[in-house]
């Protein structure tokens, strides 16, 4: 019978989740062995199992081959045995014939001893020797007992049938042997029919027995042996009486021996046949097991192939992620190279600046040399003046005057010298400038002269060209000289020539005048050009000076900017220090906040267009959210399913559950192919848990048959979601429907899709988680910073240790391809464990976690600092395996004992002692650390002062009342910043034990709570933590009401709660009576609200409140509520039969115990049971009318009250018979008021340890109380401190 196996039965998650098993393995059949899920086996284990199965298969094959060989050998032996059996049957057929002949002739053998019968007897003996007698099962008896004759002597003898008797029974098989009787025997039998009648009948009976024994498997050896022994009697022919008897006896002995041998051979053959049957059966079983192993091997191979495909997909995804990381690193490398290039350019600029710096240094050296020379000259001048003053014979007072005058003169001369040096410097600068200008002017003048010479030469050349050749050698003379020369010449004929010459001269004069004009113009042009050049030079000098000034201004501006930049960096560092001191986010965290709180930019246009069924407004989705859609389309049921349903048109519907949502149900549909067409849409928050669910888990889908008002499950199937991560398109699939008995009842069509890609949504979700963590720490830091302002400066512990966990670098997750969500945990001295905030999905988390530990310097603390080390563990919030951590670092504390701070990076090692990043830690004292030996004398002095104040106790009690430094040191103190114990004086008298227990019980409660929680609840807790638990409204101490721990603060809720308070609470009466004793219960119960309940379902007893004119403000009242009480099972109170009923009371200034005790006594709670009182008391603290109560509270806060800053609750036993027994105090519980003042938060149902009156260190139970007093305590403390300082 073939068993159906669920194809998705192997798709188990790698890591089991504690909440809901996501995958249920399908049944493999009844005979199948339960195997471990293949998804939890790695590749090596699968290969080992595969090779093991292969070796087993080969061994089974070899065994089957050996069995086949053995079967062949057995077959040959069987053929041999069948042949031998045929021979034996022939001999057995011949034996009865001889026996009947022997019986018939027995009487005649003794009388007739003729010789003609001897050959016949010899023939019979030869026949027996040839064929051999049948081997009997047992030895033949020697005495002839005779046999029953089947036929009469006269009856005819029937012929022997060839195939056996026809009248055999129906359940016997026909004989399968052939007759091997010889012709000779047949002749003898035919010749003597009368003698062999009984023999033939015995042969027929023996053959029928043999034919019946063969199909049974030769399992009747005894009967065959008996029949063979009964039929193996052969009579010999008669002989002579002398020789017949001894031969008869020998023949019988030989025949008995031969029959015994044949019977042994038959037994052996039967045993061999039985062994052969057993081997055949074993072979059949082995073949069946081999078939089963082959089927298992095929299943293992298929599972291995599917697992290999999944692993290849995972490896491909990891490879793609690695490639993306490589690309990102390449981009970062390019950016870093660009930064390096810019830094190189800046370095070149720095080299230029270094050169200029060297020049300035040289100038400074020159100035220093001049300064040395001036100092030397001054010293020489001073020495000369002193020598001249010493040589003169003036009185001592005149020398002093002279020295003063000389000093004045020297100072004046020095001033003059300095002024002259400055003038000299100015003159030298002006001289250098003038020299430069002079050189420039000289160059310009030489250039102008050269140009002028060139122009003159050009003009002269032109003039020589214009004169006649005979006159070129004569110098140009004045016209008057020429005129005189012409007058000297007397001859008149030369007048014409003179006229011509005069004309030429006039022309020359005109040309000369033109030339002179041109030269003047040229000179004017040159002068103008010189002026222009001078202007240009002045402008150039102005531009140069302007450029120098600009350069100087630019350098000054750069220096100023660098100074401003340094100042800005210093301010940033100071602000970061302030932020770290107040636990506010730093710049890196603010960047994460900025990127984590900005809206997610999704390009909806790039997404594929969907059909008409998209009716969801995607814009309503928040950042980090995604929309998952699952559509159930249609089912196709088989005939087997319809037969199981008992209806050809069944009415069915489907149910399924997805992730942590509720179960969805499709509408009803009728028919063998029901069409559901139902879509479920889930708004998911993309995180690692959801991603893991989609990758590894599957959802179960059930098809139910509806019958009237009832329904029954018809079939079930599984839907896997891993393919939806690959695309944003619709992913269609078929789910196989399996019935309750494992039959296949059909398939179901469905599709699913994610609206947005999973990777950017996951990144946005991680950034948002980081932002919310940083914002929550910002709110905490702001609250702590404001709490610092309200803390009293009058009290401080002896010292305070600051421990800061700054950041971690290079953390690696235990799972490849994932980012850890780390947080750090450590324990200092005897304090409780302190853990940091959880930074989601970060390899380099910034914690900025600061913790302050107020300590008393004792020898134990000093020994701890000198011998021990601070062990810091870093855990991964996503790792669910217990005992695993990312890394551990050990910080030696010896420098703290030497009053030195500790700051640096410490290596983290994983459980295998391999490095896994580093952690930056800083430890520092608030005050200088002084070893405990220096406190011995001040301690004695304080003890002496306290003994003077306590005058009502004896000296022995007084010595016992003052604790030592070790006793004053709290073993555990709340480690949240801003929560310190109030400074108290040593307790007086008998309350020493109570005070010591108060410290122990207070330290036993763990106040710190990690911000991160598992999975989806972490985000809910963060939102509640920001909106409700840690808002700045808590620090302002205004509008604070009792509320549930998970309720939100709103106006409507406040109004509603104020109305409830108006109906359920009231102000206390103004009491002016003295404090009543403890056992006084006869006073009336006034102004209180009581509700008594043995269990949560019991009735409440309510005392109606007193009416009041107006509701009191929170700063004018306080409300104390006793909620419930429970005892530990091992406490002595539980075994004390005298304690039947208990009630709770407390003392408060002038209020009588009748108002502060629970009005109803409840029976003692059983083991593990909690009784509820719900007794609340509103105490009036009006500033004008109740100054005494306000002063009482201030004294408690300031440590001046005997109660030492806590409110004491007493659990009292109320006897049933009040006449015979009195009330007895059972235990005490203490509530710290400083805790409320420091934290600024009211206490809501806080559990207090109840201690025994005999042993204050032994808790016997817990008392749950609530106290609304934050606003009034803050107002009283502020008011009283202002009155003290004013």
UniProtKB/Swiss-Prot annotation:
Result of changing residue 363 to T: In a patient with normal tension glaucoma
Recorded consequence of changing residue 1174 to A: Nearly abolishes interaction with RPGR
Result when mutating residue 589 to H: Does not affect the interaction with NPHP4
Highest taxon of the lineage: Eukaryota
Pfam family, any one: C2-C2_1
Transmembrane segments: none
Biological processes annotated in GO: eye photoreceptor cell development; neural precursor cell proliferation; non-motile cilium assembly; retina development in camera-type eye; visual perception
Region annotated Interaction with RPGR, chain positions: 1091-1281
Resulting phenotype, residue 1245 to A: Nearly abolishes interaction with RPGR
Covalent S-S links between cysteines: none
Annotated phenotype, changing residue 764 to V: Does not affect the interaction with NPHP4
Coiled-coil residue spans: 294-584
Keywords associated with the record: Cell projection, Ciliopathy, Cilium, Coiled coil, Cone-rod dystrophy, Disease variant, Glaucoma, Leber congenital amaurosis, Sensory transduction, Vision
Cellular compartments per GO CC: axoneme; cilium; cytosol; intercellular bridge; intracellular membrane-bounded organelle; microtubule cytoskeleton; photoreceptor connecting cilium; photoreceptor distal connecting cilium
Result of changing residue 1174 to D: Abolishes interaction with RPGR
Consequence when changing residue 838 to V: In a patient with normal tension glaucoma and a patient with primary open angle glaucoma; affects the interaction with NPHP4
Ranges of residues in domain C2: 781-906
Coiled coil among keywords: yes
Regions of compositional bias (Polar residues) in chain numbering: 1085-1096
Positions of the UniProt region annotated as Disordered: 144-193, 934-1008, 1058-1108
Assembly description: Forms homodimers and elongated homopolymers. Interacts with RPGR. Interacts with NPHP4. Interacts with NEK4. Interacts with SPATA7. Interacts with CEP290/NPHP6; mediating the association between RPGR and CEP290/NPHP6.
Function: May function as scaffolding protein. Required for normal location of RPGR at the connecting cilium of photoreceptor cells. Required for normal disk morphogenesis and disk organization in the outer segment of photoreceptor cells and for survival of photoreceptor cells.
Record: disease: Leber congenital amaurosis 6: A severe dystrophy of the retina, typically becoming evident in the first years of life. Visual function is usually poor and often accompanied by nystagmus, sluggish or near-absent pupillary responses, photophobia, high hyperopia and keratoconus. Cone-rod dystrophy 13: An inherited retinal dystrophy characterized by retinal pigment deposits visible on fundus examination, predominantly in the macular region, and initial loss of cone photoreceptors followed by rod degeneration. This leads to decreased visual acuity and sensitivity in the central visual field, followed by loss of peripheral vision. Severe loss of vision occurs earlier than in retinitis pigmentosa, due to cone photoreceptors degenerating at a higher rate than rod photoreceptors.
Domain comment as written in the entry: The C2 domain does not bind calcium ions, and does not bind phosphoinositides.
Protein name as catalogued: X-linked retinitis pigmentosa GTPase regulator-interacting protein 1
Gene: RPGRIP1
């Amino acid at each position: 019978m073939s068993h159906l196996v669920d194809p998705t039965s192997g798709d188990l998650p790698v890591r089991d989740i504690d909440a809901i098993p996501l995958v249920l393995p399908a049944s493999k059949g009844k005979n199948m062995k339960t195997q471990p899920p293949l998804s939890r086996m790695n590749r090596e284990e699968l290969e080992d199992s595969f090779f093991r199965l292969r070796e087993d298969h080969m061994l089974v094959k070899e065994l089957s081959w050996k069995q086949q060989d053995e079967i062949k050998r057995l077959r040959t032996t069987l053929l041999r045995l069948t042949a031998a059996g045929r021979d034996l049957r022939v001999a057995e057929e011949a034996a009865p014939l001889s026996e009947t002949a022997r019986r018939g002739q027995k009487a005649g053998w003794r009388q007739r001893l003729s010789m003609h019968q001897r050959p016949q007897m010899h023939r019979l003996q030869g026949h027996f020797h040839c064929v051999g007698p049948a081997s009997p099962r047992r030895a033949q008896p020697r005495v002839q007992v005779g046999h029953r004759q089947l036929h009469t002597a006269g009856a005819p003898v029937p012929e022997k049938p060839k195939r056996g008797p026809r009248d055999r029974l129906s359940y016997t098989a026909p004989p399968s042997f052939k007759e091997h009787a010889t012709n000779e025997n047949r002749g003898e039998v035919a010749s003597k029919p009368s003698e062999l009648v009984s023999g033939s009948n015995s042969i027929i009976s023996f053959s029928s027995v043999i034919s019946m024994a063969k199909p049974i498997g030769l399992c009747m050896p005894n009967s065959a042996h008996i029949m063979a022994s009964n039929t193996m009697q052969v009579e010999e022919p008669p002989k002579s009486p002398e020789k017949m008897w001894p031969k008869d006896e020998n023949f019988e002995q030989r025949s008995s021996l031969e029959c015994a041998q044949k019977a042994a051979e038959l037994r052996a053959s039967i045993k061999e046949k039985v062994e052969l049957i057993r081997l055949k059966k074993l072979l059949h079983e082995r073949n069946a097991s081999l078939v089963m192993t082959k089927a298992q091997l095929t299943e293992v191979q298929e599972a291995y192939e599917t697992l290999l495909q999944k692993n290849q997909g995972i490896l491909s995804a990891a490879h793609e992620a690695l490639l993306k990381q490589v690309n990102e690193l390449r981009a970062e490398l390019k950016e870093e190279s660009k930064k390096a290039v810019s830094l190189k350019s800046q370095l070149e600029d720095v080299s230029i600046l270094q050169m200029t710096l060297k020049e300035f240094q040289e100038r400074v050296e020159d100035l220093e040399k001049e300064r040395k020379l001036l100092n030397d000259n001054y010293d020489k001048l001073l020495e000369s003046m002193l020598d001249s003053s010493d040589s003169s014979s003036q009185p001592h007072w005149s020398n002093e005057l002279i020295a003063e005058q000389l000093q004045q003169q020297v100072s004046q001369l020095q001033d003059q010298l300095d002024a002259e040096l400055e003038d000299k410097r100015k003159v030298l600068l002006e001289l250098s400038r003038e020299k430069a200008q002079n050189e420039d002017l000289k160059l310009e003048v030489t250039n102008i002269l050269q140009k002028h010479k060139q122009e003159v030469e050009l003009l002269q050349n032109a003039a020589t060209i214009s004169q006649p050749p005979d006159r070129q050698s004569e110098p140009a003379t004045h016209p008057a000289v020429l005129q005189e020369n012409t007058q000297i010449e007397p001859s008149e004929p030369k007048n014409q020539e003179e006229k011509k010459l005069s004309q030429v001269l006039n022309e020359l004069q005109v040309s000369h005048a033109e030339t002179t004009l041109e030269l003047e113009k040229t000179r004017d042009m040159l002068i103008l050009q010189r002026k222009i050049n001078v202007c240009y030079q002045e402008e150039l000098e102005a531009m140069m000076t302007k450029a120098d000034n600009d350069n100087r201004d630019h350098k000054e501006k750069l220096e100023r900017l660098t100074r401003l930049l340094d100042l800005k960096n210093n301010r940033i560092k100071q602000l970061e220090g302030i932020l770290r001191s107040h636990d506010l986010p730093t710049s890196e965290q603010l960047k994460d906040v900025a990127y984590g709180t900005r809206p997610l930019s999704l390009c909806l246009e790039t997404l594929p267009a969907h059909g008409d069924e998209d009716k969801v407004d995607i814009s309503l989705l928040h950042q980090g959210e995604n929309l998952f859609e699952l559509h159930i389309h249609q089912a196709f049921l088989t005939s087997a399913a319809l037969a199981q349903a008992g209806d050809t048109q069944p009415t069915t519907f489907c149910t399924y559950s997805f992730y942590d949502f509720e179960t969805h149900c499709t509408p009803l549909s009728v028919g063998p192919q029901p069409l559901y067409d139902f879509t479920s849409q889930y708004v998911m928050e993309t995180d690692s848990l959801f991603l893991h669910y989609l990758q590894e888990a599957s959802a179960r889908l059930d098809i139910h048959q509806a019958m009237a008002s009832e329904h029954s499950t018809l079939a079930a199937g599984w839907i896997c979601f891993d393919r939806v991560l690959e695309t944003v398109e619709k992913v269609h699939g078929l789910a196989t429907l399996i019935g309750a008995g494992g039959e296949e009842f059909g398939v179901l069509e469905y599709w699913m899709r994610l609206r947005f890609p999973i990777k950017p949504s996951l990144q946005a979700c991680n950034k948002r988680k980081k932002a919310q963590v940083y914002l929550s720490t910002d709110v905490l830091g702001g609250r702590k910073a404001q709490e610092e302002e309200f803390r009293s400066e009058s009290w401080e512990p002896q010292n305070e240790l600051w421990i800061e966990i700054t950041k971690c670098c290079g953390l690696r997750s235990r799972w490849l391809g994932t980012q850890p969500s780390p947080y750090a945990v450590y324990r200092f001295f005897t304090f409780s464990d302190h853990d940091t905030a959880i930074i989601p999905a970060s390899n380099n988390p910034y914690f900025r976690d600061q913790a302050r530990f107020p300590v008393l310097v004792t020898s134990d603390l000093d020994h701890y600092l000198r011998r021990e080390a601070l062990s810091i563990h870093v855990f991964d919030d996503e790792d669910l395996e217990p005992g695993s951590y990312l890394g551990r670092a050990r910080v030696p504390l010896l420098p703290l004992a030497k009053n030195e701070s500790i700051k640096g990076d410490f290596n983290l090692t994983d459980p295998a002692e391999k490095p896994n990043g580093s952690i930056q830690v800083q430890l520092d004292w608030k005050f200088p650390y002084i070893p405990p030996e220096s406190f011995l004398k001040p301690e004695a002095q304080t003890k002496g002062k306290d003994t003077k104040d306590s005058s009502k106790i004896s000296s022995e009690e007084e010595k016992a009342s003052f604790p030592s430094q070790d006793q004053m040191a709290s073993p555990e103190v709340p480690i949240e910043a801003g929560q310190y114990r109030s400074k108290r004086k040593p307790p007086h008298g008998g309350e020493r034990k109570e005070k010591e227990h108060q410290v122990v019980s207070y330290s036993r409660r763990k106040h710190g709570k990690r911000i991160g929680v598992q999975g989806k609840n972490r985000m809910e807790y963060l939102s509640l933590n920001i909106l409700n638990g840690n808002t700045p409204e808590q620090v302002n101490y205004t509008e604070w009401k009792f509320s549930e721990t998970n309720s939100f603060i709103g106006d409507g809720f406040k109004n509603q709660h104020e109305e409830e308070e108006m109906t359920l609470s009231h102000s206390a009466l103004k009491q002016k009576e003295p404090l009543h004793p403890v056992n006084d219960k006869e006073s009336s119960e006034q102004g209180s609200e009581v509700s008594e309940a043995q269990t949560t379902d019991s009735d409440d007893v309510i005392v109606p409140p007193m009416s009041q004119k107006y509701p009191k403000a929170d700063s004018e009242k306080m409300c104390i509520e006793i909620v419930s009480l429970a005892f530990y099972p091992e406490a002595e109170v539980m075994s004390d039969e005298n304690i039947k009923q208990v009630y709770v009371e407390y003392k408060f200034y002038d209020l009588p115990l009748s108002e502060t005790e629970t009005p109803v006594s409840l029976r003692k709670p059983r083991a593990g049971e909690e009784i509820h009182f719900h007794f609340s008391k509103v105490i009036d603290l009006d500033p004008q009318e109740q100054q005494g109560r306000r002063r009482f509270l201030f004294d408690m806060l300031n440590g001046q009250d005997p109660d030492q800053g806590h409110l004491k609750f007493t659990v009292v036993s109320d006897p049933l018979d009040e006449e015979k027994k009195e009330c007895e105090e059972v235990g005490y519980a203490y509530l710290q008021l400083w805790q409320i003042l420091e934290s600024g938060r009211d206490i809501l149902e806080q559990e207090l340890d109840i201690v025994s009156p005999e042993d204050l260190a032994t808790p016997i139970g817990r008392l749950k109380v609530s106290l609304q007093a934050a606003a009034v305590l803050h107002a009283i403390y502020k008011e009283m401190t202002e009155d003290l300082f004013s």
